[in-house]
């Protein structure tokens, strides 16, 4: 009604008048007096496509990010364990490394070539990786099909890479082999200076398993 609209307008005007009447606030900072360490939260960067790391434009961007901060710059890329799938072309959104496959007997085959090239690129620039353990390789997924995502309207993005492992012992061995390989390649001192995390945003659709199944990834 007109009466209600008038009342709302008067209320809004009163708020505006109230804010205008507020007194100014003076803040003084004594820069000569330390109050604690300033954590360089600005020196962490991340992106979806891990293979962008080794491309010309990707390396140029990493150089620029490194120059932004005197503090150590950490880089986190998704999909460091994701499989390529069956598509003949590149998976330009999510990316892949094909680090894990299984032979016909179910024996694991580890291939760290792509992962190494990504981590090498960080190390060469004095950066540190924030190693994201994920996502689920196709041959280890408890629901591998479909694995590739689709971009059509209403298409499924959250496919086989979002599911728990079909065998948690194989998952544990995969993580162990990855860390062991990293220590052999870069040295224990270097690897212990990295940050590690399990998955990305498991509270949303990046994880299609249960809460309990996610927690079991840490066992």
Residue ranges of model-derived segments:
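Substrate-binding/catalytic cleft of secreted carbohydrate-active enzymes
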Residues: 202-212
């Amino acid at each position: 009604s007109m009466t209600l609209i008038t009342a709302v307008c008067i209320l809004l005007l009163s708020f505006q008048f109230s804010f205008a009447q507020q007194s100014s606030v003076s803040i003084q900072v004594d820069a000569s007096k330390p109050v604690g360490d300033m954590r360089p939260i600005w020196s962490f960067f991340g992106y979806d496509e891990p293979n962008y790391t080794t491309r010309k434009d990707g390396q140029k961007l990493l150089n620029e990010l490194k120059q932004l901060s005197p503090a150590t710059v950490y880089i986190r890329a998704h999909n460091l364990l994701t499989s390529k799938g069956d598509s003949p072309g590149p998976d330009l959104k999510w990316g892949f490394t094909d680090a894990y496959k299984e032979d016909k007997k179910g024996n694991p085959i580890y291939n760290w070539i792509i992962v190494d090239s990504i981590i090498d690129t960080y190390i060469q620039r004095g950066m540190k990786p924030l190693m994201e353990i994920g996502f689920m390789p196709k041959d280890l997924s408890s629901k591998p099909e479909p694995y590739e995502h689709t971009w059509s309207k209403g298409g499924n993005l959250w496919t086989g890479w979002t599911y728990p492992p079909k065998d948690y012992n194989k998952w544990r061995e995969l993580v162990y082999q990855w860390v062991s390989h990293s220590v052999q390649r870069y040295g224990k001192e270097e690897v212990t200076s990295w940050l590690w995390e399990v998955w990305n945003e498991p509270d949303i659709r990046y994880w299609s398993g249960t809460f309990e199944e996610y927690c079991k990834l840490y066992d």
